[in-house]
């Protein structure tokens, strides 16, 4: 614990808490100040000036990062017949129907993404209390309720991320790993930022992005200059 505290202090000394950095500077600092003993995840956290209580100001969706996330997702698909075969060919880790529902109800959760064809949602709905709180429930807005299961599986395996604004207007997302080249992290950030900017509700007033930080697992939050975006 003492060693970790020392590493944290060393990281804090390299970051000016009163300064907002450019994206390039923030990414470089995130890599430099990372002290985790593993390949830490790099994340962005936005605070948006939106009122999620209003239906037209709820932000939720999915996108594929140009350089991936550095993580291999375990994909579960609820489908039957030809669609089940398509999912298997596309590389889904688990494909099934009632058998998977029973397994999940028994406590099994060794997967990262859940995809379902529309006709399977009545069955999947039984898992709402399990999947919902973990943000694993299939949803058309994130492309996880679809007839094109092959595309959904391939995207999930190829760097697809989902995002959703919470009650306070906060949106968090993974943009890669510390082991990524800085340029690739910046590219991923810019792609995600473009998505967030395009998602701005027409009825949102004032400054849209009020705060933005980049951080690593166990790392220190580095403030990004929103005016430089």
Curated annotation (Swiss-Prot):
It holds the Pfam family Ribosomal_L1. Keywords: Repressor, Ribonucleoprotein, Ribosomal protein, RNA-binding, rRNA-binding, Translation regulation, tRNA-binding. GO terms for molecular function: rRNA binding; structural constituent of ribosome; tRNA binding. InterPro entries: Ribosom_uL1_bac-type, Ribosomal_uL1, Ribosomal_uL1-like, Ribosomal_uL1/biogenesis, Ribosomal_uL1_3-a/b-sand, Ribosomal_uL1_CS. It comes from the Bacteria. One of its GO terms (cellular component) is large ribosomal subunit. Binds directly to 23S rRNA. The L1 stalk is quite mobile in the ribosome, and is involved in E site tRNA release. Belongs to the universal ribosomal protein uL1 family. Part of the 50S ribosomal subunit. NCBIfam families: rplA_bact (TIGR01169). This is Large ribosomal subunit protein uL1.
